[in-house]
Amino acid sequence: MASEQNPLGLLGIEFTEFATPDLDFMHKVFIDFGFSKLKKHKQKDIVYYKQNDINFLLNNEKQGFSAQFAKTHGPAISSMGWRVEDANFAFEGAVARGAKPAADEVKDLPYPAIYGIGDSLIYFIDTFGDDNNIYTSDFEALDEPIITQEKGFIEVDHLTNNVHKGTMEYWSNFYKDIFGFTEVRYFDIKGSQTALISYALRSPDGSFCIPINEGKGDDRNQIDEYLKEYDGPGVQHLAFRSRDIVASLDAMEGSSIQTLDIIPEYYDTIFEKLPQVTEDRDRIKHHQILVDGDEDGYLLQIFTKNLFGPIFIEIIQRKNNLGFGEGNFKALFESIERDQVRRGVL
């Protein structure tokens, strides 16, 4: 039920919509991650991919909102669908709280929507679940669906936003004031040459988080590199929660997905710090998985290199730990800097 803490009745993420000038490449990425290509929209050139509770829409419309979004940004997350108890109630409540409504003639999809980060759209979806959802009502079966062996990714754990310097508080307040997100972490992260600050917000229903990143110092940091390539603020990465990250990476071995390189010295001490890790340590080293935690639990995570434009994917497995890998920030940041050096940015 909607409440003071959850004023719009938010219940989680229903879908992520992608727009891209290179449809074939995006399709291959989805397949390599274990998504099945199942359905197409009845009226639009939009294809539906699924893996467990992660739903992707790949928009190939030549005109309209997502087409223009891709022209502006390149490969992009043009919209998301967020689950709510009542879509019209959530939409009206969001607008009353200061959100900008999206007009019907602007949208590619027929659901109530507001503008979100970087003028992407947030649709409000109140039909979801196994028996009654938008994929049964608004989509139809493909003549030749592609059923892929899933890779163990069960839901979107978090999605990270990159914003211009001086606007982090604005976007933090957007999520807090309109949806009821709460701040759960603040980070000030330094690498060898660059730095950033980050707020992490949790949705009022507790189902997902949105960290917001802002660069520090000169414009060569990873956040400002993203903003330049993407032409504005937007979603930097999605994090897939895995039920077994080692098994997921074993299943993806040999695919097109490349992950960041971690210096071998990282593993000299990590298992002394976290002796409770039960996963195969040789496989952790082989896949260059990062590990972080405390006496109560730990998490395992890995990051791809930039996959589509400046956007990448994180894979995370949580074992009684709700953090973001704070203990790995220095190693991760320096790995990203090495990748920036390789690409001539630093």
Curated annotation (Swiss-Prot):
Gene Ontology biological process terms, A to Z: melanin biosynthetic process; tyrosine catabolic process
Amino acids binding Fe cation: 158, 237, 314
Cofactor(s) this protein requires: Fe cation
Compartments where found: Cytoplasm
UniProt xrefs under InterPro entries: 4OHPhenylPyrv_dOase, 4OHPhenylPyrv_dOase_C, 4OHPhenylPyrv_dOase_N, Glyas_Bleomycin-R_OHBP_Dase, Glyas_Fos-R_dOase_dom, VOC
One GO CC term, this protein: cytoplasm
CDD domains assigned to the protein according to its UniProt record, in alphabetical order: HPPD_C_like, HPPD_N_like
Pathway in which the depicted protein is active: Pigment biosynthesis; melanin biosynthesis
Cofactor-binding details, from the entry: Binds 1 Fe cation per subunit.
GO terms assigned for molecular function: 4-hydroxyphenylpyruvate dioxygenase activity; metal ion binding
Keywords for this protein: Cytoplasm, Iron, Melanin biosynthesis, Metal-binding, Repeat
Domain VOC: residue ranges: 12-141, 155-305
NCBIfam families: 4HPPD
Record family assignment: Belongs to the 4HPPD family.
Designated name of the protein: Protein MelA
